[in-house]
Structure formats: structure tokens, C-alpha cells
Amino acid sequence: MNTWLLSLQNSNSPTYDMMIFFHDFTMMILIFITLLILFIMFTMINNNLINRFLLQGHFIELIWTITPMIILILIAIPSFKILYLTDEMFNNKITIKSVGHQWYWSYEYSDFLNIEFDSFMIPSNQLNPNEFRLLDTDNRCILPFNYPIRILTTSMDVIHSWTVPSLGIKMDSTPGRLNQSLLYMYRPGLYFGQCSEICGTNHSFMPIVIESTNFSYFKNWLKSFL
């Protein structure tokens, strides 16, 4: 996994697919507007012709009033749709709970005999050659792909934020409040995230690792806790 890529990470969930589409759609509009303005500026600077009889132009004013309204509507429609779908819950098969602490995460699989464990960052001097500095943890959150999963999150102390960019998920972990989001992964793999809310001295050292596997491996992993 290249951690120095430009632009966005590769998508691994439907939510992030929609976010990437919205990003590209918005950038296309912004680039078009920028090029149009530059063209008009360049044309006017180099134009020696002057219309001395133009006092007002109702048609031009109508165009530059209605056009921005249409552009904003075109941006707002997919934006509201994505905002709604990120909070929508449907047919979730598994529920897990993520609890933020200073400065680590703990996970609870309450659907399966109350399985609980803590997830700490692996110090740099204990990393294996195939592990990532400041991103790998001693206990990964293992979940099956192609299954709708409900993620609950809260905090035991200060406000944290449970964020995995390649899955298009970011939730505030607030003390005394339970937030939820739907997670759906396309394929197996390791997905890395970090706390995205400044929460104290070691804020930069509480990573998140999601290991996406097939359901049979997930069941065998659950049996190891029995």
C-alpha cells in the first residue's frame, strides 16, 4: 500500500465510490468555470473594441444570475443523496462497537458471545518488515466482506473520530453518545485509518486496521475466542 499517493485512495466500498464520483463531478465543474473565466479575462484584456452605447444588459444579467443557480442545484442533488445514504441503515447482518480511549481503540463483537479486545499501535522498534509504521496494530478488527455491517462508536474519555478513508467512513466517537454507520466492503484486504479528531498528546498514535476476509475465515477467527 503506497501511503504517499496523490489524490484519493482506491475505493473499497459503495459509499466511497459515490464520494469519489461527487469529487470528480465537482472538480469538473470547477475546472470548467475557471477556464471560462480565464478565457473571458484574456479576451477582454486583448480586445480593443469598445461598445459606447451599451448602458445595461438585462439578458446578460439574467444569464449570470440563473447559471450559478443551476450549477449549485446540480452540485446539491448528489451531495444530499450521498449525505443521506451515509446515515442509512438497511439489512445489516453484523454489529460491532468501537470505543475510543486515550490513546487506543477497543472493539466489541456483541453479536458473538460478547467478544472484546483492545487494539494498540505497534511501536516502531517492534514492527515486522511487512508492517507499516504508525499504522499497524497488535489486534486487527476482522470483518467479512460482502456483508452489511453496522458500526457503533463512542468514547470513554474525550472526543475521538473513527476514520477509514478507503472505506469512506468517518464517525465522531463522543462520550455519552452512540453514533452509527453502515460499512460494506467489496473485497478482502487491509484497510488503514487513524483517529481524525485531535484528542491529546498521542493523537497521532491510535491507528485503525480493518482486515476484510471471507466469512468462513471470520467464523474460524471467532471460534478462537471460545
Swiss-Prot record:
Purpose of the protein: Component of the cytochrome c oxidase, the last enzyme in the mitochondrial electron transport chain which drives oxidative phosphorylation. The respiratory chain contains 3 multisubunit complexes succinate dehydrogenase (complex II, CII), ubiquinol-cytochrome c oxidoreductase (cytochrome b-c1 complex, complex III, CIII) and cytochrome c oxidase (complex IV, CIV), that cooperate to transfer electrons derived from NADH and succinate to molecular oxygen, creating an electrochemical gradient over the inner membrane that drives transmembrane transport and the ATP synthase.
Superkingdom as given in the UniProt entry: Eukaryota
Membrane topology, Mitochondrial matrix segments: 48-61
Native source organism of the sequence: Lasius sp
Residues that span the membrane, as ranges: 26-47, 62-81
Record key words, sorted: Copper, Electron transport, Magnesium, Membrane, Metal-binding, Mitochondrion, Mitochondrion inner membrane, Respiratory chain, Translocase, Transmembrane, Transmembrane helix, Transport
Catalytic activity, as annotated: 4 Fe(II)-[cytochrome c] + O2 + 8 H(+)(in) = 4 Fe(III)-[cytochrome c] + 2 H2O + 4 H(+)(out)
Mode of membrane association: Multi-pass membrane protein
Gene Ontology CC terms: mitochondrial inner membrane
Subunit structure comment from the entry: Component of the cytochrome c oxidase (complex IV, CIV), a multisubunit enzyme composed of a catalytic core of 3 subunits and several supernumerary subunits. The complex exists as a monomer or a dimer and forms supercomplexes (SCs) in the inner mitochondrial membrane with ubiquinol-cytochrome c oxidoreductase (cytochrome b-c1 complex, complex III, CIII).
Amino acids binding Mg(2+): E197
Key word Cell membrane present: no
GO biological process, one term: ATP synthesis coupled electron transport
Cofactor(s), names only, from the UniProt record: Cu cation
Subcellular location: Mitochondrion inner membrane
InterPro entries named among the record's database cross-references: CcO_II (IPR045187), CcO_II-like_C (IPR002429), CcO_II_C (IPR034210), Copper_CuA (IPR001505), Cupredoxin (IPR008972), Cyt_c_oxidase_su2_TM_dom (IPR011759), Cyt_c_oxidase_su2_TM_sf (IPR036257)
Protein name per its UniProtKB record: Cytochrome c oxidase subunit 2
Annotated EC: 7.1.1.9
Binding site for Cu cation A2: C195, E197, C199, H203
